[in-house]
């Protein structure tokens, strides 16, 4: 039997998983790497950490699977928007990677908006003018690394999102490519025409010579160096992490929704061939591109989801591991009604307030670790409802009523029950929770001829548990109203 290696390069760790051609998980390897915070609001990664952790976990997963040379394809999924610039000749990065959470270009984005550029950028890219996306991060690098722009014009420097950088490293510098879903997150890509936008690149003074070639999500992206796995292996599937999860959740029908809970939270609504223009400040993006055909989605992005649990552990030091939060939440005093707005790096969709910062409301002398844990988990549910309310406002006729969930926090029954309660709709957790890796493994396997097409793959999607709403509507709306007042207070400061 043939096997597929799925590389999942995330914000805090790199993971690698081996699947067989029936898409059964055979092995997993994971390695965390350091986060770099040079200044408040700045977030960086050392690209060598990204590469070394990917190489180590990929080799480890293949070894643990004991697959005896039957590796047939590789798929790559990745943290999106994060920017790497490297030398074409040596492969050496010219600066740390600037991470999607980084807010250093907030003033630049504000200036561009004041100059009237946001409508054109949004119409073409589907994105809002925000530091979250790659374009202004890339401009910052070209502005602040001496000689970088001139070198880029001479073809000496290359830009890529993390997938592109990893493909370059895996292929030994033979392929400078990306896929449509990652390109769609740069704020440089015209998602209607499927090309890099010359006008936006010109506005930001970004040499187009440094941009990668854009391909379908299932396509030949290059062959790995022979020394990595004993022979050359084709890279046949690439998608940004949230789009890969959309595929892994088999959300192929317009109206289907999924939400992934990792460091952040990302909800996607499949809108099919229709590019829905959001009136509620959501993003219009590419869900996946197969056979040259683009399928679109509305997306809402929350910057802080699982990261709020990391804050409980690393910042407040009231837990030692994430799994403790569910027990604490169960033991909390619900009457306390503590509210945490975790705007540590600003507010994401649908507010888009990069300057906002977090706050805690409703503190009393009896507020302790249990109440903080409960409020932290509840904040993720509240933010998800914000996204779903905006999606329904934009595309009410097509949205289905069930939300499919995945990611680390989806393991928490308490969190998913609260999510169902606060959104007032069923929440479905799949049997296979590694949907991001599964999605890109399927893309690579389909391109290799090992896995079925979308319809047959969707028929095999299996439900592990459905969480039905149990909270009374009056309680739900009162709690959500309190959350809304807390968010408005944060934005007013």
Curated annotation (Swiss-Prot):
Binding-site residues for ADP, renumbered to this chain: 11, 15, 263, 306, 408
Q: What is its EC number?
A: 2.7.1.30
Show the catalytic activity.
Answer: glycerol + ATP = sn-glycerol 3-phosphate + ADP + H(+)
Q: How is its activity regulated?
A: Inhibited by fructose 1,6-bisphosphate (FBP).
Q: Do you know which SUPFAM superfamilies this protein is assigned to? A: Actin-like ATPase domain
CC per GO annotation: cytosol
What the entry lists under Pfam families is as follows:
FGGY_C (PF02782), FGGY_N (PF00370)
Q: Which Gene3D superfamilies match?
A: 3.30.420.40
Residues that bind glycerol, according to the entry? 80-81, 132, 241-242
What are the binding positions for ATP in this chain?
11-13, 263, 306, 310, 408
Q: Pathway, according to UniProt? A: Polyol metabolism; glycerol degradation via glycerol kinase pathway; sn-glycerol 3-phosphate from glycerol: step 1/1
The UniProt annotation places sn-glycerol 3-phosphate binding at 11, 80-81, 132, 241
Q: What class of enzyme is it?
A: transferase
- InterPro entries on file: ATPase_NBD (IPR043129), Carb_kinase_FGGY (IPR000577), Carb_kinase_FGGY_CS (IPR018483), FGGY_C (IPR018485), FGGY_N (IPR018484), Glycerol_kin (IPR005999)
UniProt-recorded Gene Ontology molecular function terms: ATP binding; glycerol kinase activity
Q: List the disulfide bonds.
A: none
Recite the UniProt keywords alphabetically: ATP-binding, Glycerol metabolism, Kinase, Nucleotide-binding, Transferase
Q: Which GO terms describe its biological process?
A: glycerol catabolic process; glycerol metabolic process; glycerol-3-phosphate metabolic process
Q: Which family does it belong to?
A: Belongs to the FGGY kinase family.
Q: NCBIfam families recorded for this chain?
A: glycerol_kin, PRK00047.1
Q: Summarize the protein's role.
A: Key enzyme in the regulation of glycerol uptake and metabolism. Catalyzes the phosphorylation of glycerol to yield sn-glycerol 3-phosphate.
Q: Give the protein's recorded name.
A: Glycerol kinase
Q: Which organism is it from?
A: Cereibacter sphaeroides (strain ATCC 17023 / DSM 158 / JCM 6121 / CCUG 31486 / LMG 2827 / NBRC 12203 / NCIMB 8253 / ATH 2.4.1.)
- Gene name as annotated: glpK
